[in-house]
Amino acid sequence: MAAPATEHVRNIVLVGQDGAGKTSLAEAMLHVSGKTPRMGTTHDGKSYLDYDEEEIRRHFTLGTSIAPIPYKDYKINLLDTSGQADFLGDTLATMQAAEMAMFVVDAVDGPQVMTTRLWHEAEAMRLCRCVFINHIDREHANFDVAMATLHARFGSRLGAVTIPMGVDKDFKGVIDVLRMKARYFEGEDERVEEIPEDYLDVAQVARDKLCDLVAEADEDLMMKYLDGEEQLTQKELEQLLDKAIAQEIFIPVFVGSTIIKQGIKGLMEDIASYFPHPRAHGPFYLANGNELYVDETGEPAGFVFKTLSDPYVGRMSFIKVLSGYLEPGMELANARSKKKERLSHLYVMMGKEPMDVKSAKAGDIIVVPKMNDTKTGDTLSLSGDIEVDPLPSPIPLYPIALEAENKKDEDKLGTFLSKQAEIDPTLRLIRYEETHQQVVFTMGDMHVDVLLNKLKNQAKIEAHLVPVRIPYRETIQKTAEAEGRHKKQTGGSGQFGDCWLRLSPNPGEGYVFASEVVGGRIPKNLIPAVDKGVQEAMAEGYLAGYPMVDINCVVFDGSYHAVDSNEMAFKTAARLAFRAACQQADPIILEPMADMDITVGEAYAGAVMGDISTRRGRIVGTDSNDEGETIIVVRVPYAEVLSYTKDLRALSRGSGAYSVRLNGYEPAPYDVQKKLVEQYEASRK
């Protein structure tokens, strides 16, 4: 495939709820264009795009696949994305590489939760949008209801470019409202005829609506049109359509059935003729505040919107060419790492199959292998000075901890997780020193399940989930004094240390050590040993093995032996004194607290607030946003919201979102402390 000119490239990202038929639409377009000898399907595991073992097993898309389709003189890059919330990060990153987001909506189910969320994301990106109403031949399909729902949800700018002739089992073709023709797809061929008489009225109504919306792209023409002075001619309508779409004045709606390939060829014609090309779209925003428009004549540069690891090829970087052109052998600089990367090969991906290309011009999408210092969100350019400001990835909030079945695989497990985190921005690794545990933050149960299967099938590591340890802490509530005396005689030189400690609470100020020893009761050179012994005892905890914090410690008296006193003896004495004082100082366990902002539809707010109360949380306040959603601000023990990602989805039917940040510690309730102490004591037996 020769490198197409920028004006002849169309980058379309397919988005929407899982099951609406995004992959089927891409497969239908591939087949209708002649790119594939048969139409791939997900249900039998023979999709060209859903080729991953996990995708075949689950029958839906887990990550972005690319389908490059040659159509006439154009190249249509279809970016097929996941409709699962757990893989939202990959979908959002891919949307940055497109000029048009095509929302695939089921004719029966209508727009679902993920459709709505991605619609608002596309709107925020200033990404052009269109809709394909799929499965119009499905039982109980209703085009009018689907359109009404779309208008109610997304506004009045949506207008039908094609409408169905019949629905459900009576569906036989589509009416092309733009050209006022009827289209029938029979076998491998399409037949275009005049509109049947019984559909002329409904076609004219749709045509008038189309003209009303598109006319707004030209102010002078719109005034004449609205005043009734003249109607839009076919030529005027076609000339204004691409402008109206690019300026988001008009959002086209198409209809069809991917399974029987109805409505597909006309859709492809309109994509080529009227959808925005990369240069006509808005700019990329750079980290330095400047803007960069896609331009064939500019400095060679590309933006990495996806990274994956292939077991045979290695790391593969999916790149949107921003300016100039790229070709094998080029050496580009990474704006983030400042390292040079050589473009060994340029591929165009067809599902999992790489196809070598000699060059790629601005606006096109390619894949480059083996750029090991480059990751998702990076920008590469000849100078290294161009850096796109990427959209932030969704923050993973669902924590898990993993252990290898075989202890010998622990290092391999850590290495694999680190590499996965490099290519997947929604996978975050944090090691908590308080618990000596590495926690993997994910997007949800499905994300975890896929990760475990990759461990098993790709890395050949068997691993299992273990409970995430909460970073509890311990402290004291009263002032107390105690002596620690260590004396040991073993026949030679012995050990002797004796010190008195005063412990007092020091809320929020951490650990402070001081000496009030006078008269040489403890030599000055052994005072640091007392400090070390106290810190070692604090690290071990007193009640349940959690580190102790916020304690003011004063050593004020003691005694020593000229021969037997040494650093080890006074460290031991300090530990004994510290534990004896803690016993009198009313020790408690502190639990980490989380501040959360929970955003849900008003209908779910009551259930969410009730649920937070059962988690020992406090409602701090409520607010609302521009979408009419309720924002609930809460403070809750972190231990109670480890699984909140999936819990909120259940409470809000998948529509809720939240942020969480650890913010301080508070005394744990008695029953929580009792349970933690019992667990600790049982583990020591």
Predicted regions and their residues:
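Structural and coupling elements of P-loop NTPases
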Residues: 1-685
